[in-house]
C-alpha cells in the first residue's frame, strides 16, 4: 500500500504500498460533519465515545470482489477492541459502476461521492469502505498498492490486487492479507502513526512517514507493499499493533 497526502499546500507521496490521500474540498453531509478531510482528522471522533456512540461501516463492493465475511468480522472485532463505540454495524452493498482496470485517486473519490449513502449524523459516525477490481494508478515495478486511506472516514481496498498477491504467496490466504490491509488502513483513520493521534513516545518511521518503526507491528510500512507481502503473509498471522501504537490510541480516547 502507499500513503498519499494531498492538501492545498503540498502533495506528498510516500514510498510504500499503503496509501493515504486527503482530497481537496470541505463538503459537508446533512449533519454538517465534514467527511472530506485528510485521514486522521477524525481520529478522536472514531476512537472516543464523546461525540459519536455508534459507528456504521458502509462496505461498497463491485461484483466479484466482495470482501470475505471473516475479514469483516475481524474488522468489527478490532473496532470493538480499540475504540469506545457502543454499537458497531457493518453493512455490505453491491454497487454498479463503470469498471476500469486502473483507478486513480480521483476515480476513487468520484465513486464514493456517487455511491456513498450513509453519513455521520446524530450519535452515528459513518465510515466508507470501497472494494474495487483492478489496481491503483500508483502501482510501480517495485510497489503494489493494496489499499488507501484517502479521507477522514474513507478507505479503498484494491481487492483484485489482494487476490492476485495472495495467489502468488505459497501458504498465504486471502483472508490474512485482506484483513491485514483493512486493519492497517483503518488504523490510519485512527490517526496512526502521528497522523492525527499524537505519539506518547516517538516511534514514527521518519523514512516512511505515518508508519511505525517496529517491524512486527501492524503499522510497519513494509507489510503493506504487495511486493513484500511474502515476508509475513505466509505465516498466516495478522500482525498486531505494538505497545507504542496502542498507547497512542489510548491517549486519544481509544483503548
Region locations from a protein language model:
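Sec-exported extracytoplasmic/periplasmic mature domains
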Residues: 80-88, 187-195, 250-254
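Active-site-proximal segment of zinc-dependent metalloprotease catalytic domains
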Residues: 121-200
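Sec-dependent signal peptide recognition
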Residues: 2-10
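Propeptide-to-catalytic entry region of secreted or membrane-anchored zinc metalloproteases
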Residues: 19-136
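The catalytic-center signature of Zn2+-dependent metalloproteases
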Residues: 169-243
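C-terminal motif of bacterial Sec signal peptides marking the signal peptidase cleavage site
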Residues: 14-17
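Surface beta-loop-beta hairpin patches that serve as ligand-binding interfaces in beta-rich domains
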Residues: 238-255
